[in-house]
Amino acid sequence: MDGILGRIVAIVLGLLALVGIAYAGYNGFQSHKAGVVATNITQLITNARAGFSQGNNGYTNFTTANIASMITGGMFPSDMVRGTALVDPWGNAVTLAAANNGSQGVITFGGGNGQTAKQCVSAALGLKDYVTLAVGSTTFNQTNLPDQATAGAACSATATFTLTFQ
């Protein structure tokens, strides 16, 4: 009887350990997505500055309509490209636009209910070097940067990010 009880306890403990490992892996993967967002958007901004800011038109051609041509030119991180479209790690479409007479670029992403509020906060805190960052209905800038509390208040699973850079 002791042998059977010992085996049952060992099996239960083994299953609990597997559940714990799976949960930790899932949380790590979810946090990783927010880091990928920050890395990809930062790389995109760097590439856009190199490809557009020095031209006579500024960011005028930095638009969703020109994504296919910019893919050909290697503008985007490869994991953002799906055919002739751009997506974020949560599977949402990424759109591009010019603002302020072509002197600024605008990147919109997120908002498709694929992100968690925690990922939203991590992404908001990880994004840097922008003119403005709108998260949902809250706008941040270089004199009003997000922190854990303000990003937490702005974030949700449906919050859209709109980042404007120069």
Question: Can you say where each PLM-predicted feature lies in the sequence?
Answer:
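Periplasmic/extracellular, small/polar-rich flexible segments of pilin-like filament-forming proteins
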Residues: 53-166
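N-terminal single-pass transmembrane signal-anchor helix
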Residues: 1-37
